[in-house]
């Protein structure tokens, strides 16, 4: 598998390392506006290949993306402490459009994973600018949020996170929606499990949801960025593609019409295989969850409309 990574900040470089450790990249091209940084990362990773499977890793340009199976987009300005993901939009939208034009030119048949925040909006801009197949362009979405929530529940209830099944959908950010109505531990509905163990109540579950939502902010406040967990999440996504696992993951995908949400990239459960997104799964949400999901979609739609209006204004002024 040939993998291209655009953007070698902490997320991009950590993702390259995670992919090297997974061992399924025979070729990895690293692209960054700072070519020396990309070259440094490539050398550092190459020196680790005696301890992993052999891989050809090098710094390159967009033209080197030709023949890539997967392209990971992690380029963008970093999130500031206290800054929401949506506030990042204006600073990253133009960067994303430029990347989209180059990726579609040199690797039009690749599967593209957008990681840059705010991921839902930027995935939408990438898709629209590139004109690529919507099944092959998606964002990392709420994969990490889902993992965070499962971890919190597992730690509290004393189970492995792998035995906890719950999804976080909607925006990867402040308006994300935990789907409590479908939450299970080992096949037992979470509400029933809570009654058995008598450890959980609605306030505790609400606290889990809030901790999940605030996790990135807390990490950024302490160390400046989140990068290890998201790198592992992206490597996990690529693994599902490589092995054609058809796993169900909450990715930010383009929706034509999903529970009343149209023309938007937002996180919902999908099956992912070697050809990209194969199925979009429609959840049976309760009224409260459905309302929250549509509200989340509305927030993202408004953000897209605002930046589109700004872009049109800028073009008219410059023209």
From Swiss-Prot:
Its EC number is 1.1.1.27. It comes from the Bacteria. It catalyses: (S)-lactate + NAD(+) = pyruvate + NADH + H(+). One of its GO terms (cellular component) is cytoplasm. GO terms for molecular function: L-lactate dehydrogenase activity. Optimum pH is 7. InterPro entries: L-lactate/malate_DH, L-lactate_DH, L-lactate_DH_AS, Lactate/malate_DH_C, Lactate/malate_DH_N, Lactate_DH/Glyco_Ohase_4_C, NAD(P)-bd_dom_sf. The modification Phosphotyrosine is found at residue 217. The keyword Phosphoprotein applies. It is an enzyme of class 1 (oxidoreductase). Beta-D-fructose 1,6-bisphosphate binds at residues 150, 165. NAD(+) binds at residues 10-11, 32, 37, 62, 76-77, 115-117, 140. Long-term stability up to 80 degrees Celsius. Fructose 1,6-bisphosphate (FBP) increases the thermal stability at 90 degrees Celsius (pH 6.0). Keywords: Allosteric enzyme, Cytoplasm, NAD, Oxidoreductase, Phosphoprotein. One of its GO terms (biological process) is lactate metabolic process. Catalyzes the conversion of lactate to pyruvate. It is stereospecific for L(+)-lactate. This is L-lactate dehydrogenase. It comes from Thermotoga maritima (strain ATCC 43589 / DSM 3109 / JCM 10099 / NBRC 100826 / MSB8). The gene is ldh.
């Amino acid at each position: 598998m040939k993998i291209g990574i655009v953007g070698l900040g902490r997320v991009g470089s950590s993702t390259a390392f995670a992919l090297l450790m997974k061992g399924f990249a025979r070729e990895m091209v690293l692209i960054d506006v700072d070519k020396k940084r990309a070259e440094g990362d490539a050398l550092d990773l190459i020196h680790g290949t005696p301890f992993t499977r052999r891989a050809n890793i090098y710094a390159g340009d967009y033209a080197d993306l030709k023949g890539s199976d997967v392209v990971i987009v992690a380029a963008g300005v970093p999130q500031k402490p206290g800054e929401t993901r949506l506030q990042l939009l204006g600073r990253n939208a133009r960067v994303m459009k430029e990347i989209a034009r180059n990726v579609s030119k040199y690797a039009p048949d690749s599967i593209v994973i957008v990681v840059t925040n705010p991921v839902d909006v930027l995935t939408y801009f990438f898709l629209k600018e590139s004109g690529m197949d919507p099944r092959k362009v998606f964002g990392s979405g709420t994969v990490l949020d889902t993992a965070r929530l499962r971890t919190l529940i597992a730690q509290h209830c004393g189970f492995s996170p792998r035995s906890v099944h719950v999804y976080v959908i909607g925006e990867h950010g402040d308006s994300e929606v935990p789907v409590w109505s479908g939450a299970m531990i080992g096949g037992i509905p979470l509400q029933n499990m809570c009654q058995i163990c008598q450890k959980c109540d609605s306030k505790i579950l609400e606290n889990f949801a809030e901790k999940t939502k605030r996790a990135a902010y807390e990490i950024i406040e302490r160390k400046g960025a989140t990068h290890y967990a998201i790198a592992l999440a992206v490597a996990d996504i690529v693994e599902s593609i490589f092995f054609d696992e058809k796993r169900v993951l909450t990715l930010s995908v383009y929706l034509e019409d999903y529970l009343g949400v149209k023309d938007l990239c937002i996180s919902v459960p999908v099956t992912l295989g070697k050809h990209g997104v194969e199925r979009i799964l429609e959840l049976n949400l309760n009224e409260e969850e459905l309302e929250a999901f549509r509200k989340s979609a509305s927030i993202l739609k408004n953000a897209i409309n605002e930046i589109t209006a700004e872009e049109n204004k800028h073009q008219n002024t410059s023209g």
